[in-house]
Curated annotation (Swiss-Prot):
This is 2-C-methyl-D-erythritol 4-phosphate cytidylyltransferase. Pathway: Isoprenoid biosynthesis; isopentenyl diphosphate biosynthesis via DXP pathway; isopentenyl diphosphate from 1-deoxy-D-xylulose 5-phosphate: step 2/6. Belongs to the IspD/TarI cytidylyltransferase family. IspD subfamily. It holds the Pfam family IspD. The record marks R14, K21 as: Transition state stabilizer. GO terms for molecular function: 2-C-methyl-D-erythritol 4-phosphate cytidylyltransferase activity. One of its GO terms (biological process) is isopentenyl diphosphate biosynthetic process, methylerythritol 4-phosphate pathway. The lineage of its organism: Bacteria, Thermotogati, Thermotogota, Thermotogae, Thermotogales. The record marks R153, K208 as: Positions MEP for the nucleophilic attack. InterPro entries: IspD (IPR001228), IspD/TarI (IPR034683), IspD/TarI_cytidylyltransf_bact (IPR050088), ISPD_synthase_CS (IPR018294), Nucleotide-diphossugar_trans (IPR029044). It comes from Thermosipho melanesiensis (strain DSM 12029 / CIP 104789 / BI429).
Length: 227
C-alpha cells in the first residue's frame, strides 16, 4: 500500500500574516487543491492531510469535493516533525509495517507524477528515500560573517519532498528520536535513528511556495485571496 501524508500544519506567515497560503487561489484552485490533486492517483491508496487546528473546518470544506473515502484530515503538531509524528501515530492501526509512507510538503504543488513514482520505486528497494536536486551555486559555511569552509558542490544536494519510507522505519525512527523540535525534515529524523537514506533525483520545478514572489517567479500572474 502507498500512503500519502501531505503536511499543511504551518501558518505560512512568510506568505501572509493574515491569510494562510494553502487557501490562496491561483489558476482557479487553492494551493491545497493543487497539491492534493497530484496524489489522486490509483497507485495512492490512502491520503492523510495534516492541518493546523485553526484551519481544520476550512480545510474540510475544500477537501469535501473529493469523494474518495480514503482521504482523512487530522490535526498537526507544534512543529513540522510533530505533525509528521501525529500522522505516524494515526496510521498505526490502518497500515502494515511494509507499506510505503510518502510525506510531502503541502506547499509544493508542482510535484510531478514521475517524481512520486520514482519515490515508490526506490523505497521498495532501499526502505528510506529523499527527493533531492544537486546544488548549482557554491555553498559556504559562514560563522560570524566569516567564510569558514567551502565544500565541493558535487557532494551537496538541496532536499525536497516527497520523502518516502517503509512504515516500520518511519515508526521506529519517530519512537526513538525524542528531541524532534531540532529537526526540520523527516529524512533527518530517520538518518539520526541510524538508517541509510537514499537520494531520488527531483526536479527544479518542484519548488516550495514560501512567499508570494515564488508564485510570480514561476509565471502565476494572478493570486486570489485576502493577502
Amino acid at each position: 500500500m502507498n500512503v500519502a501524508v501531505i503536511l499543511f500544519g504551518g501558518k505560512g506567515e512568510r506568505f501572509s500574516k493574515d491569510y494562510p497560503k494553502q487557501f490562496v487561489k491561483f489558476h482557479g484552485k487553492t494551493l491545497m487543491e493543487h497539491t492534493v490533486e497530484k496524489f489522486l492517483e490509483n497507485f495512492i491508496h490512502l491520503i492523510i492531510i495534516v492541518v493546523n487546528g485553526e484551519y481544520l473546518e476550512e480545510s474540510k470544506k475544500i477537501l469535501k469535493k473529493y469523494k474518495r473515502k480514503n482521504i482523512y484530515v487530522i490535526l498537526g503538531g507544534k512543529t513540522r516533525e510533530f505533525s509528521t509524528l501525529n500522522a505516524v501515530k494515526y496510521l498505526k492501526d490502518l497500515i502494515s509495517e511494509d507499506d510505503n509512507v510518502i510525506i510531502h510538503d503541502g506547499a509544493r504543488p508542482f510535484v510531478s507524477k514521475e517524481v512520486i513514482l520514482r519515490n515508490i520505486d526506490f523505497v521498495n528497494k532501499y526502505g528510506a528515500v529523499v527527493t533531492a536536486v544537486p546544488v548549482e551555486n557554491t555553498i559556504a559555511f559562514v560563522e560570524n560573517k566569516i567564510v569558514k569552509e567551502i565544500p565541493p558542490r558535487r557532494y551537496l544536494f538541496t532536499l525536497q519532498t516527497p520523502q518516502t519510507f517503509k512504515y516500520s522505519i518511519l515508526y521506529k525512527s519517530f519512537r526513538l528520536i525524542k528531541d524532534l523540535e531540532k529537526f526540520t525534515d523527516d529524512s533527518s529524523v530517520v538518518l539520526a535513528a541510524g538508517y541509510n537514506v537514499h537520494v531520488v533525483y527531483g526536479e527544479k520545478t518542484n519548488i516550495k511556495i514560501t512567499t508570494k514572489e515564488d508564485l510570480y517567479l514561476i509565471g502565476v500572474e494572478k493570486i486570489e485571496g485576502n493577502i
